[in-house]
A protein has these predicted regions:
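Catalytic helix-loop patch of NAD(P)-dependent Rossmann-fold dehydrogenases
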Residues: 88, 123-165
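Rossmann-fold cofactor-recognition segment
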Residues: 39-53
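NAD(P)H-binding glycine-rich loop region in Rossmannoid oxidoreductase-like domains
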Residues: 51-89, 100
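Amphipathic terminal alpha-helices
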Residues: 266-271, 278-305
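Conserved Rossmann-fold NAD(P)-dependent oxidoreductase catalytic core, especially the SDR/UDP-sugar
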Residues: 96-138
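N-terminal Rossmann NAD(P)H-binding glycine-rich loop of SDR-like oxidoreductase domains
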Residues: 9-30
Length: 305
């Protein structure tokens, strides 16, 4: 059944106390009837409990039109949480949301996934990786594996007549040193507000039962830049992003010597009618105005996904 194109929807956001879930809840509440579901009590959690509470989940999803499923364990948990717990939360939890959604007659699930699941495929030897929906993931961690498994079960259910699904593989979206975050915004980072807008667009996207999109900041780079990005990133930045080069020079920051991957959101731009609006200049503005989203500069190094 297609989603309504204009009337307000009843939407449940899981993981609504988290960074991304909260941003999505706040954005959607401007035009829809939104309730949040999370283990942590907060202003955006109308239902407080765990996804393994089937009765609570059923009540939360009663008469819902759509579910946005953000609740998950993430990369920082890998060193601290057993693999079995990852599967319990990321795979079994997604299955419980799917089952409750199907029972409630939910028509659309938007699943918040991650570009991290591409694993080693994102960083080939000798070149920056060009990462889009056509690239086959090579998962490395339990986080990668469980997000892929959750995607697969949602996609299979949609293909068999269950709720339609839109899978959004989002890039880095958390506080980092300003010089790192600003550079990443060109090729592997995104603002939480742009993530929220992508979810809003995915709610009403027509088309197949299941579709997957890479969600990342707008990139000035082209696929043909990948070899040079790997070995001579400053020269490519001079050509493709002179405003960032000038801003870094003014602040005395070094440019990255190597860029190892580029996430391309082109399919989402074309299909969803979505446009990321908060690029590197917004990162600098947030830093200059002491917004705690952005940390002080470091030497330019950053942890991997």
């Amino acid at each position: 059944m297609p989603m309504p194109t204009s009337s307000p929807l009843k939407i449940v956001v899981t993981g609504s106390a988290g960074r991304v879930g909260r941003a999505i809840h706040i954005r959607l509440a401007r035009e829809h009837r939104v309730s949040g579901f999370d283990r942590t009590p907060c202003s955006t959690a109308d239902w407080v409990g765990d996804l393994d509470d089937a009765a609570l989940l059923a009540r939360a999803l009663h008469r819902a039109d759509a579910v946005i499923h953000t609740a998950a364990l993430h990369a920082p948990h890998v060193a601290h949480v057993p693999a079995a717990r990852f599967r319990q939360v990321n795979v079994d939890g997604t299955r419980r949301v799917l089952d409750a959604a199907a029972a409630a007659g939910v028509r659309r699930i938007v699943f918040t996934s991650t570009t991290a699941l591409y694993g080693s495929a994102a960083t080939p030897d000798g070149s920056a990786g060009w990462v889009d929906e056509m690239l086959t993931p090579q998962p490395q961690t339990i986080y990668h594996h469980t997000k892929l498994e959750a995607e697969a079960l949602l996609r299979e259910a949609a293909d068999q007549g269950g709720p339609s699904v839109r899978i959004l593989r989002m890039s880095r979206c958390f506080p980092e040193p300003v010089n790192v975050m600003a550079a990443f915004r060109l090729h592997r980072g995104i603002d939480a507000r742009d993530v929220a807008e992508a979810h809003a667009a995915a709610l009403r996207h027509a088309g197949p039962a299941a579709a997957t999109f890479v969600i990342s900041g707008a990139t000035p780079f082209l696929r043909e830049d990948c070899a040079d990005l790997h070995g001579a990133a400053p020269a490519v930045l001079q050509r493709r992003a002179p405003a960032l080069v000038a801003a870094f020079a003014q602040r005395g920051w070094a440019l990255p010597e190597r860029i190892d991957r580029v996430y391309s959101p082109q399919r989402a731009l074309d299909a969803l009618g979505w446009q990321p609006r908060h690029g590197f200049a917004e990162v600098l503005h947030q830093y200059d105005t002491h917004v705690p989203e952005v940390l002080p500069p470091n030497d330019g190094s950053a942890a991997s996904d």
